[in-house]
């Protein structure tokens, strides 16, 4: 391996940590200072926030306790405030509580109401000025410039086909540019002197006139406030507040930086409002474009899009809260007596608390953390979304926004993005990328000096803008020992085009071939041999792999597994040099000492270990110690493995013996055939922990009670409950079993008349309660692993109205079974179609049965050949007893490097004793395989190897579902849909066509009536089935009645008529009321349901 794979990546969740740090150190203070001072309407009272001295109190609970109690992990913010009474000169100082601020955990997450959440980074258009070229229908070019602030009114300048310059304020009607320039107080000379082409601008003056400053202000007021009497002072005030008032208009630091850069100004970084010079320079640049001077902007270029991370999003939300707070403070100052006022009585923390709660609880960017496995967690924190407040919407986003842009190179991964409506709107940060102070994404490069790569110097981080004018070579170009680039011509990127140049011309070289892709994609070995669409699926499916009972790291990896595991926060990492003094399943203790002198000891550090915790996705979080007592440890060493890691490396799946061969059609269409060994040996067994919760509330009729005394339940059903009616830990439960017994008081109205009679006779003996116990849902079973009880008496915080909350955790071991989804790392996914006994599986010449048979037809059309390389290299590795780390993009070691490497290693493996059958020169990579049922060899050699296969979280147990009778929708009275609602399968329009084509009249009639929404009919049908009678004729479906009512509401008289024979044989017309169900007769049709006895028939006729 070269130095490429050993280059350690930067801390992968730095983007979260750094942003939150910035918020605590600068962002929060900045906001508090911008609102200080707040004065009342008369100006005699002033309230100052002393933002830089704000304090955070210790959190009430630590991280684990917050999760246990369903609380938020947050701190109280206190700000020193000063109230000054201008009339009396009195000054009052006080520390005021302004709200709770959720704290970021070490892993870059927040704990809100006991659930771990992640704030996703948002990518938005950067404030600044943008120039755009448009062609009208006659093919004439016109240009427009948009001045976009961080907050405030947009300003748009445009030229029309006659070469006149106009301006629009906030998308209103257009004004002559001269009106705006004169209104902001510029003289004619100042305007014309600062333009490069005053003669072009003169046309606008000739056509639109040249107003004085007063006329311009009146004109402006007319356009912006039509219908109000225009005044000069009104125009002045309007203009001031729109563009020159820091409260209403803010370019932001970034906006000022972009504006200075584009228009070559040198305004100070602190000038956050527009200046007349900005507007003049913007118009000048626009006019220059007409003369082909300057460039138009590409809004999808990453130089024009910036990332807003946690800190900034939170700062914006705090601004919203402080805005509301400011209004309240002003009102209180005005209303109250000034002597009695104190800062604490003025400042009400509610609006700020609400704003922060709203942001963390319901913002589109605050997401429930995907915790399926460590990789999913890491990727979620590095996600970049264009959606959310201030961003795009799915419907409005066109193709250009979603597409890969040349400036994404090394910044945003071109591969990892969702499939479906969000494709391209949600991306992932590339492995080496970082976000700079302005929010632009940077990526590192090594300097090249006269053809020599300076790897001895620190890499330089460049933004997309800076990189555009450089000649940048990729990270996989061959170099010699000194770092001189080998070869005459080097492929480079220059100004977003690919070309070649001589080594001396190259300015920079990429740090590593992996730097252009994201962490998940960089876990795919032989990525360069896979089609991008399949690599995308592979990246996304690794995030859905379930942590298995016995994790096993891949035989063929990429070398980044260890860092991904470490940065995900799932493993425990030593912070110091030291000696392990104690290890058990719950904690590791380390006695630190100085690296040079072991005698200098520090205070003992205790690392707690998580055991069998439930993750957000119901998978199991469990850590296992890797060190032993007395072992020396160094900083950064992994002390304990987490879920889906082994030896401190990511281990999402298992290495299993795979053959690419069809077997009796069981792997048709991507289905997968597996061996029973994977079930028996628990190769793909995972643990899932589910949480069930019940609360005893205070009702109008009295409190609900958690108890063992449940009406109408036998002792057998209660055998596992303790004296309080709560299940004991360790009990095995199946669907329908009681977990927590609960009874609810029943009102008089709920009681049937016979019960009222009994109560009247026997007095208050029978307790009027209803069984409301928590039971195990349908299709679930498992063992109770934990029970937590929270009560008011113990001082726990409970939801309003609840007296007691009980949580039960049920764990189940799920072996792999037919219907589960499996996948490789190359987007090769499939559903298990059959589990064969070991003796029937095809076997190798040494008698080993295959573990899994995949369809060879899944490879050619999908073009993910990487799986074949992986499978063969794994085969060589297994026979040689070694693991491989293969960095993607290996062509720098020569043409066809992957193929040569694999070929050479397979040959080497076949030279080991008794391994000559492993490799056959005549058909390399293929082996003779025998049929397990007959012992005959298959008629041609088969590709066999070790593949790393994952079991995905889409488990059949969670999806399988059946319904006989169940709930119905309130309005349409049709059965509900979906497993969660205990719903039915929708027999849709096209399915009905199929039955109509067969003429299956009775099935159709039942589908549309008794099985769906004929209310009376379905009850009668059920009774008839239960009693074994024939099913009566159906009535009118509810949906038809709804249609009738809708037509009647339109004034249409809809009625059904039938022809009846009267006594004298005349036929008469009678209207039928479809809204009421008349008495039904049994249908005159063959009865399949039951054989009638004579008594039955007599009963029916009555």
Swiss-Prot record:
Regions crossing the membrane: none
Keywords in alphabetical order: DNA-directed RNA polymerase, Nucleotidyltransferase, Transcription, Transferase
InterPro entries given in the database record: DNA-dir_RNA_pol_bsu_ext_1_sf, DNA-dir_RNA_pol_bsu_external_1, DNA-dir_RNA_pol_su2, DNA-dir_RNAP_su2_dom, DNA-dir_RNAP_su2_hyb_sf, RNA_pol_bsu_bac, RNA_pol_bsu_CS, RNA_pol_bsu_protrusion
GO cellular component, one term: DNA-directed RNA polymerase complex
Gene Ontology biological process: DNA-templated transcription
UniProt EC number: 2.7.7.6
Enzyme class (EC, first level): transferase
A Pfam family it matches: RNA_pol_Rpb2_45
GO terms, molecular function: DNA binding; DNA-directed RNA polymerase activity; ribonucleoside binding
Disordered, as annotated region: 1076-1102
PANTHER family: DNA-DIRECTED RNA POLYMERASE I SUBUNIT 2
Protein family membership: Belongs to the RNA polymerase beta chain family.
HAMAP family, per the entry: RNApol_bact_RpoB (MF_01321)
Role according to the record: DNA-dependent RNA polymerase catalyzes the transcription of DNA into RNA using the four ribonucleoside triphosphates as substrates.
Subunit composition and interactions: In cyanobacteria the RNAP catalytic core is composed of 2 alpha, 1 beta, 1 beta', 1 gamma and 1 omega subunit. When a sigma factor is associated with the core the holoenzyme is formed, which can initiate transcription.
UniProt protein name: DNA-directed RNA polymerase subunit beta
